[in-house]
């Protein structure tokens, strides 16, 4: 995924299994985090009902090869999410791809429990991610910067402000 991003300047998807598959991917994800490399990691997970999180018990592990990978990778990803509702899968995938590419690129991680992977989903009921508010803010900031530049440039041209470069 890192090499693909470096050569194509586009995201690659890494698909890993639960437990050790996720932990083995952490080194590469950390490298992507440090070097600002965008990538999307999708990991498998045991059924939601056999995760520690679903039980709220003070255990380290509940299901076979279960690991709360979300908590492990939060410090080295721009976005991480365990999918708990089948209808939210599209929303979180779209959000992950958007975040991985926006601003300073970086890795994102989506964890998908087995029961969510096997769920029947009505495509018409899938939630979608719409970052309109973020885009609007960026456009507003861009206009503010342009306006500021025009004011500075005008004052420089009038001799009111002197810049020294060197």
Where in this protein do the model-derived segments appear?
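N-terminal alpha/beta PP-like core and its mobile active-site loop of ThDP/TPP-dependent enzymes
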Residues: 1-166
């Amino acid at each position: 995924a890192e090499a693909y991003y470096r050569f194509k300047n586009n995201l690659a998807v890494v698909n890993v299994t639960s437990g050790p598959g996720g932990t083995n991917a952490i080194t590469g994800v950390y490298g992507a985090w440090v070097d600002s490399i965008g990538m999307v990691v999708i990991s498998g997970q045991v059924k939601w009902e056999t995760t520690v999180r679903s039980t709220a018990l003070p255990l380290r592990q509940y299901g076979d090869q279960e690991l709360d990978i979300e908590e492990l990778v939060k410090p080295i990803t721009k976005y991480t999410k365990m999918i708990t509702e089948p209808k939210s899968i599209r929303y979180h995938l779209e959000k992950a791809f958007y975040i991985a590419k926006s601003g300073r690129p970086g890795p994102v991680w989506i964890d998908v429990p087995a029961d969510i992977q096997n769920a029947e989903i009505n495509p018409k009921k899938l939630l979608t991610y719409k970052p309109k508010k973020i885009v609007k803010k960026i456009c507003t900031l861009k206009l503010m910067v342009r306006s500021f530049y025009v004011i500075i440039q005008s004052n420089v041209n009038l001799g009111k402000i002197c810049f020294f470069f060197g």
